[in-house]
């Protein structure tokens, strides 16, 4: 079992100058005199910012920081980068990525109070407040200013978090801000392990600056490979130290059997699909300046599993913090942020009404009570008594439950179609409908993929397969061990009683509150592995209603659910056995079978065989609305060579070749789907 410590918020006091003081470390968060000026001098000026940005030929500049604290350093850099971009709109450098580690994050209320000291940063601080995440362990990604700024907040002890940051051999970080409380106040952080970890993540030429001039810090950084020197300190402080990495020693923490590759100089991509995976990925790539061509087999987007009227948005959590839970907790928070940002640009039916899971039988009760033992923040999930559940749901259920206050529902069809149409209007996406891709062929001489649809041939630098249950129509992904499950969702008219339901209700099925747009609820959904067509199933229609009656036999209002109108929608889900999506480079099945035939005996695996510039985003299952935005962000980060939004061990759990590798490690042959 993975052991994960819950995150404690910082305990603060405020001194006479109005400066926050840590109770844990008995130290101020920033200078009593002029904290913002000190930040600019110590961290921007000594890292030669913004001067370096003018000559940088990268698309994205990466800063890493020890100790997020009040976010002052981040806000100051954000302000400086916006000014740089406004003054230099044609500069090659387009985006800023800020990675920060924090063991004791401030609560949102303390963060807001601390930011009152800097009114000139208010416009940036308010955007941060809006999306400041819950204190969930590991990485929480926030995308700001439509992708101009990306903030990765790693919550937890830096000695645990730093090794989880996925790092390719060339490194990741352009500048280090070595901040945090004074070494004398926080000796656990300031050690050789930290300095060595900084060097491992650093790129060639990475700079470093810190407010302290402590000799052991300077010597430790030198031992780690940085060339450090003393410089004039800020204000009355005599000295501080700054420097740069002398020589980059290649380092990676990515296992060869789970390696992934970026597409160097990515300019354009073909996405095969048309559902929520395609729409979120297209949006995320377009933010990075990548031109998108969409090939959709249907006459318009969202005709498959993403075409429902109402879909629930809530996380899949586990009390033992297994891989699924560690993916879905940050994925849900990112989805919530992402959906709110999308709602500022397009219209789609949605309601953050909360989601309530009923303890309707002994098995469900045991499972949900076990989940609550995971010590999650109550803003994410909390247990409710039967009486509290009745009040929360709006109709009598007389069952205890767990409630997700930040959850809700949205119309996936409207979201998917709205995103794709918006990108097309902006000239960032070209869509080809009724264009199924029959064949993919890699052209070594041009380093391009050739796509065939009927008699028509197209060429693209990079291809992503995001076609849901149709993943096996192409030879490159035909062997992926994914399943297909048909689902039928029933549309039922509301009644006076049913209209009182004000939370998504989950039991052995689910029921949504009424949509104010059409006066209907959604109830479902069936699971059928035998019949994978899109035809209406009268038995599934009856069973959708019967599940609610079965789970709440003492209540009369479920009898008002009328499925007799036979209104419904059918789709086929693409599912994985371990409940996690398949995200990343597509492995070359035949070569992997050969190269890893004796993997169980190999001391160190050779790098896994991957198709060049070919990726997959499939297997989103029943929780695609909660996972798709972060999975798209993860894949875009991988394709573009950006920092990853999840720990390196979780990337292994999402790798499209993971099940093949697991089987081969056990000495079993890959003769058929795993």
From Swiss-Prot:
Pfam family for this entry, one: Methyltransf_30
SUPFAM superfamilies reported in the protein's UniProt record: FAD/NAD(P)-binding domain
Region entry FAD-dependent cmnm(5)s(2)U34 oxidoreductase, spans: 272-674
Protein EC: 2.1.1.61, 1.5.-.-
Chain spans, region tRNA (mnm(5)s(2)U34)-methyltransferase: 1-246
Molecular function GO labels: flavin adenine dinucleotide binding; oxidoreductase activity, acting on the CH-NH group of donors; tRNA (5-methylaminomethyl-2-thiouridylate)(34)-methyltransferase activity
GO terms under biological process: methylation; tRNA wobble uridine modification
Subcellular location: Cytoplasm
Keywords of the record: Cytoplasm, FAD, Flavoprotein, Methyltransferase, Multifunctional enzyme, Oxidoreductase, S-adenosyl-L-methionine, Transferase, tRNA processing
HAMAP family, alphabetized: MnmC
Family according to the record: In the N-terminal section; belongs to the methyltransferase superfamily. tRNA (mnm(5)s(2)U34)-methyltransferase family.
Name of the protein in its database record: tRNA 5-methylaminomethyl-2-thiouridine biosynthesis bifunctional protein MnmC
UniProt source species: Vibrio cholerae serotype O1 (strain ATCC 39541 / Classical Ogawa 395 / O395)
Lineage, uppermost ranks: Bacteria, Pseudomonadati, Pseudomonadota, Gammaproteobacteria, Vibrionales
Gene that this polypeptide is encoded by: mnmC
């Amino acid at each position: 079992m993975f052991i994960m410590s819950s995150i404690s918020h910082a305990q603060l006091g405020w001194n006479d100058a109005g400066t926050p003081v840590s109770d844990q470390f008995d130290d101020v968060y920033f200078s009593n005199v002029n904290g913002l000026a000190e930040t600019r001098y110590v961290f921007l000026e000594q890292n030669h910012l913004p001067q370096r940005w003018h000559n940088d030929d990268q698309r994205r500049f990466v800063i890493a920081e020890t100790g997020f604290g009040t976010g002052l350093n981040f806000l100051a850099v954000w302000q400086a980068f916006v000014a740089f971009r406004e003054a230099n709109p044609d500069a090659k450098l387009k985006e800023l990525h800020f990675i920060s580690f924090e063991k004791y994050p401030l609560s949102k209320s303390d963060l807001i109070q601390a930011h009152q000291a800097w009114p000139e940063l208010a416009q940036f601080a308010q955007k941060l407040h809006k999306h400041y995440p819950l204190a969930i362990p590991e990485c929480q990604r926030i995308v700001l200013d439509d992708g101009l700024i990306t903030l990765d907040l790693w919550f937890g002890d830096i000695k645990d978090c730093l090794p989880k940051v996925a790092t390719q051999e060339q490194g990741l970080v352009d500048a280090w801000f070595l901040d945090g409380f004074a070494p004398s106040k926080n000796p656990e952080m300031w050690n050789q392990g930290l300095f060595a970890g900084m060097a491992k993540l650093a790129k060639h030429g990475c700079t470093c600056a810190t407010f302290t001039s402590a000799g052991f810090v300077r010597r430790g950084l030198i031992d780690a490979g940085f060339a450090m020197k003393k410089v004039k300190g800020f204000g009355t402080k005599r000295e501080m130290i700054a420097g740069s990495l002398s020589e980059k020693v290649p380092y990676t923490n990515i296992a060869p059997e789970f390696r992934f590759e970026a597409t160097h100089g990515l300019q354009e991509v073909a996405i095969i699909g048309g559902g929520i995976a395609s729409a979120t990925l297209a949006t995320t790539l377009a933010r990075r300046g990548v031109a998108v061509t969409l090939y959709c087999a249907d006459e318009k987007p969202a005709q498959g599993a993403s075409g429902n009227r109402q879909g629930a948005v809530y996380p899949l959590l586990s009390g033992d913090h297994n891989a699924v839970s560690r993916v879905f907790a940050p994925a849900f928070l990112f989805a919530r942020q992402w959906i709110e940002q999308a709602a500022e640009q397009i219209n789609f039916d949605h309601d953050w009404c909360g989601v309530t899971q009923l303890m309707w039988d002994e098995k469900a009760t045991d499972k949900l009570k076990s989940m609550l033992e995971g010590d999650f923040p109550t803003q994410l999930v909390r247990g409710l008594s039967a009486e509290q559940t009745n009040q929360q749901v709006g109709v009598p259920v007389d069952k205890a439950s767990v409630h997700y206050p930040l959850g809700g529902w949205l119309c996936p069809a409207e979201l998917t179609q709205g995103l794709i149409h918006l990108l097309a209007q902006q000239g960032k996406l070209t869509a080809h409908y009724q264009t199924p891709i029959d064949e993919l062929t890699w052209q070594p001489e041009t380093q391009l993929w050739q796509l065939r649809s009927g008699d028509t041939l197209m060429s693209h630098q990079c291809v992503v397969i995001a076609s849901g249950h149709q993943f096996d129509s192409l030879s490159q992904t035909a062997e992926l061990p994914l399943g297909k499950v048909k689902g039928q969702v029933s549309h039922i008219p509301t009644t006076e009683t049913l209209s009182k339901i004000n939370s998504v209700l989950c039991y052995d099925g689910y029921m949504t509150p009424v949509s104010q747009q059409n006066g209907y609820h959604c109830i479902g959904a069936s699971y059928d592995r035998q019949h994978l067509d899109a035809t209406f199933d009268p038995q599934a229609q009856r069973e959708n209603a019967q599940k609610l009656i079965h789970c709440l036999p003492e209540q009369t209002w479920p009898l008002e659910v009328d499925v007799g109108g036979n209104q419904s929608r059918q789709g086929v889900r693409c599912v994985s056995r371990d409940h996690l999506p398949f995200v990343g480079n597509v492995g070359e099945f035949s070569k992997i079978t050969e190269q890893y035939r004796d993997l169980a005996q190999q001391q160190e695996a050779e790098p896994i065989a991957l198709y060049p510039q070919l990726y997959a985003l499939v297997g989103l299952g029943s929780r695609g609305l909660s996972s798709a935005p972060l999975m798209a962000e993860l894949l875009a980060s991988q394709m573009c060579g950006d920092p990853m939004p999840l720990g390196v061990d979780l990337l292994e759990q999402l790798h499209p070749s993971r099940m093949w590798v697991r089987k081969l490690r056990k000495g079993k042959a890959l003769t058929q789907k795993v």
